[in-house]
Structures are given as structure tokens and as C-alpha cells.
Swiss-Prot record:
Active site: C333, H475, N495
Organism expressing this protein natively: Dictyostelium discoideum (Social amoeba)
Family annotation (Pfam families): Inhibitor_I29, Peptidase_C1
This protein's name: Counting factor associated protein D
Cellular localisation: Secreted
Gene: cfaD
Glycan-modified residues: N94, N111, N423
Described purpose of this protein according to its UniProt entry: Inhibitor that slows proliferation of secreting cells (also known as chalone). Requires aprA for activity.
Principal location class: secreted
Amino acid sequence: MNKFILLLSLVTLSCVLAVPQLPAAQQYYMKGSFNIPYFNIVEPIELIYDSVNNRQYISVYNGMDITINFYNQDNTYNVGPVKYDMVCTTTPGNGSLVNVLPTEPSSWVYNGTSTVNGVQVFGYSQKITQYGRTGFYNFYVDANGVPVQFYMDGVDYVFGSHPDVYVLNFDIYTTDISSYESYFDIPVLCNNAKEAPAKENQFDGLFSSIGDNLLAKEEQASNLFKEYKAQYNKEYSSQDEHDERFINFKAARKIIATHNAKESSYKLGMNHYADLSNKEFNTLVKPKVARPSVTGADSVHDDESLRSIPSTVDWRNQNCVTPVKDQGICGSCWTFGSTGSLEGTNCVTNGELVSLSEQQLVDCAILTGSQGCGGGFASSAFQYVMEIGSLATESNYPYLMQNGLCRDRTVTPSGVSITGYVNVTSGSESALQNAIATTGPVAIAIDASVDDFRYYMSGVYNNPACKNGLDDLDHEVLAIGYGTYQGQDYFLVKNSWSTNWGMDGYVYMARNDNNLCGVSSQATYPIPTKN
């Protein structure tokens, strides 16, 4: 009997000890989906990670966009759609591989079993609290240690996007990549590839704020940076890159801690850009394209009269603003500002709020310099709407977070159309205020390149370093109202970085402050057709 009890105890103990470890592989293949539940995005993804040979294959939407990184050859091929055709470009230079597995498994805490996607899993977690913002991260493996799901409630570990809920599901995973060697064959389409200018690796750089001791010695800072890399799955391709990231990391900590230690109308909070240089941040979130010399606007809104308009406007109160959307890891901000203005002004004119398709603009509005996820302008969007007649609804032509083939020849239009569009007098905040009050939400371009804008959390943003020249504008947003908060005038601005950024997706931009950040430098709105 005692032997039986001892045997049973040993069996029980062996079961307790048989907890699979988090995977750590130098080579692997995975197939699954990358999901953003907030905006109902389910992006099929196929990825080969090969740190042994310093190369990588990434395909999304079943081959709609393919990136093959040959960092061992200082070259990258990208195959993707441009309006109705697939094209190939090649980009010289090195970069960092995208690893979807935790690089420091020992820093994760085991927290028991559960069921995910119908599979009994073993979960590991991290909880990271920084400047009032807490992120929760869970990595689930099956009994054999095979990844099942990476759940991120905070910053996107994988591709380095703003705080949100991200879910990476693994359908297939193997560390034997020999069967997938053909994936690294250069596509035939790339025989005539066009060379794109070299740019910073768009997948580099996540965030952290590990402590706020500005007097820390270099050794202490180095230890904090080590924790940062472990917590946020950071890998750098060389010692030189590591040293550069360390400098950026220390600078980000200083920016936030220094700002929040003083009196200010707004507060900052850490997010996923702390080890990025300004150039990298601009490339990742706000790609700039050549500005069109002619906008094609029908007229200019130059009415600066403030006598007969309300002292406060918020078009959400009239149900003329759709919920905050999420551009994800795509430089498509220009489409969200444009659809937001068309949605709002159509609502004011016709009394109906219709959520319109940003993806149709990404895929089809290849006009006057606009390049889908590579950036663009509201004027291009409105010119396209005039040309095509009407955009589809968001539900009929849903957002992909990715350039796609244009479907405007087959998709059902929404019926929302415009007769033209109007530019607001450049630099006139009173004209912008009048336009918002009398016509509805207005698409505006701002300078979002100042370091602290990416960390904005609350209050009236009024950093004097923010510029207002036309060539300084790098991010399209939507002005939906104005008012005064704690004695400071503001424009109420809707961003496209989900509700996890700022004040549930919104920011108070300083008003009557010398056109700070260029809020009125390039404001545009459409003229909806009256039903």
C-alpha cells in the first residue's frame, strides 16, 4: 500500500514537473493569423524565421503582400499590389529579423493551464506597468511546447505598433524549415524589380520605461536596458545597433520623466517607440510622400467670423462621428482623416452616419502622390471619390491594414457622394473653427514628429517645438470640435491609433496658439451631395 502511495506521488509529481517550456528556436516556420479585435482585422500570416542565415520570409493575406529579407545579402524583396496590378520592389540594406517568440523565456512567469482555440494550453505571462499604463502579455503553448497563441493587451510585440489588443494565433509551427526552402526563391515578378530607396527597418523598435531614476549610473542604465530587451522581445543585429538603441532608450526615459515632473497642460506615458530614432518613428507611423503641387479644391473656406457660432462644438453629440478606428501598422492615416470628414459632413448634410471604406482609398486612390500604406493626402482621397462616384461602406470593403488589389469595379457603392471639396484658409485657426462649426468634421494634417506626441495621454497638447509649415506636416487626423479646458482653448481631434492612445483615441490640440502643430495649415473638407 505504501509503495502504491509512493508510486502515485511520483506520478503526480512527474505530472506537475512536466510543464513545457517556452520555445526558443533559431529557425522556425509558422502559419496562422494576426488579429486586431478592436477593428475586426484578421490578417492571415505565414512566416519563416532563420537567424542562422540572417534571412526571413513574411506573407500576409495569403500572398497578397510578400516580404523576403536577405539580410545576409543586404537586400529585401517586396511583392505587393499597386491598384490593379502586383509589383515587385527591391530595397538595399540590412535590418532586424521579426521574431514572434519570446527571446528571453526565463523572464516570463508560468501561470497555469487553460483552453485556447480548443487546445489545452500552458500559459506564461508578463505584466508591465509604466506611467499609469499597464500591459498584459500571455504566451500559450501546448503539452509539447508548440506555440498556440500570443495575446498582447498593450503594445504589439511583433510589428511594433501602438497599444491595443493584438492576438497572434499559431495554426502550424515547426522548427524544421527545410521543406520551405523554396519560399526563399526570388519570385519571377522580381526579375524586373524596381529599386526602392533604403529606409529604416519598419519592424524594429518596441517600447519600455524601466524606472525613472534620471541619476542612474551607466551600469544601472545598462541593467535596465537588459530588462527592457527581455520584457519586450528585442533583438539587435549588431553591437553597433545595440549601442544606438541603448542611446534612444535612455533618451526616451528622460523625455517622459522630465516632462511629467514639471507643470504642463498635458501628460506623457510610455508606449512602443522608446528605442526608435525620430527617423524610424516617422518611417513606421507617418511615411511622407511628395506633396502635390495642385490640390484641385473647388474653393477656399475663408470665413473667419466667430460671432454666430457656438463656443463649444463636439460632433459626437450629434452622432456624426464614427467610433475611433485603427490604422494599425500601415501608413494610411490620410484615408482615416478623409473618410472621417466625409462621414461627418454627410451626416450633417443628410442626417445619416455611414461608416466608409478606408481600404478602398488605400487600394484605389493612387493619385497625385498617394501610395496606400506608404502615405497620402486628403485631396487625393476626395479627387478619387469624385472620379469614382461613391465609396463603399466599411462593411462591404473592410480594412486590411495592408495594400490590396483595387476592387472598385465590383464593390457596391454606399451612395455617399460629393460635388467637390474645400480647402480652409491655410494658417487661419478662426477659419478652421468656423468650418468645423458650420460644415462638420474637417480633415487636418499636423506635425506629429515631436518626440512627446507619440507618448501623449491627456490634457491640451501645446509643445512649442511642434512646427506648422506645410513640409512639416506628416500625419492626417480629424478635427471634430473645439472648446476650452482648464482655461486653454483646444481643437478636439480624432486620431486613428485606436482607443488605447491618448484620451480614448482623441487629443486636445492647442487652439489660438499660433497654429501650433499646423492644425490649420492644411485643412480640407468635402461637399456632400444633398439627398
